[in-house]
Amino acid sequence: EVILQLIFEKKIDPKIIKQKYGSGHELAIKHLTNSQLSYLFNLPSQRTVVLNDISFQLNHGAPWDQDEYLYPDTKIKTLLRCNSINHNFVLVGHSHYSFYFDCGNSILINCGSVGQSRKKGGIANWTLIDTNNKSYKMNDCLAKFCP
């Protein structure tokens, strides 16, 4: 979490970040230990996880550039760059816009955001993936009414 680290190192003003993103970063610094913060700062930019023989590539942004945003209306040629012969699912975030795209060998999914959806304020987005049959379901609800 680059923004969190910059706030922690006093390289950016937390008030500016709070105006744009809310108080999550401030709460993290207040309530997490230095060890927990260090863990977050040193997470890999990309990771592979296998559950029930289903392979997931985890990314914050695009697989080739974690700072690149992918949107539902991103050009197909760009989305196809996410195709992976080594993974069943390629999971991305960063844009907070929920969408999925069948890349051929893998399914690209951005589940959106529970707390900061960019599609519509107050809507929580998430995705459930069934590792028994490789099915997935994208979900959303009004955040205050979510189960």
Write out the residue ranges for each language-model feature:
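Divalent metal-coordination and catalytic microenvironments
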Residues: L40, H60, H94, G112, ...
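Acidic, His/Gly-rich catalytic cores of divalent-metal-dependent hydrolytic chemistry
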Residues: D102-P147
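Active-site neighborhood of divalent metal-dependent phosphoester bond hydrolases
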Residues: E1-T48, I54-L58, L70-I85
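Active-site environment of divalent metal-dependent phosphoester hydrolases
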Residues: E1-L6, Q66, L91-D102, Q116-G121
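Anionic-ligand binding region
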Residues: D73-I109
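Short, acidic/polar N-cap/turn motifs at the starts of alpha helices
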Residues: P44-T48, Y97-S98, A124-W126
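Active-site-proximal beta-strand elements of phosphoester/diester hydrolases
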Residues: S55-A62, L108-G112
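Short, solvent-exposed coil/turn segments
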Residues: N42, L51-N52, G104, G122
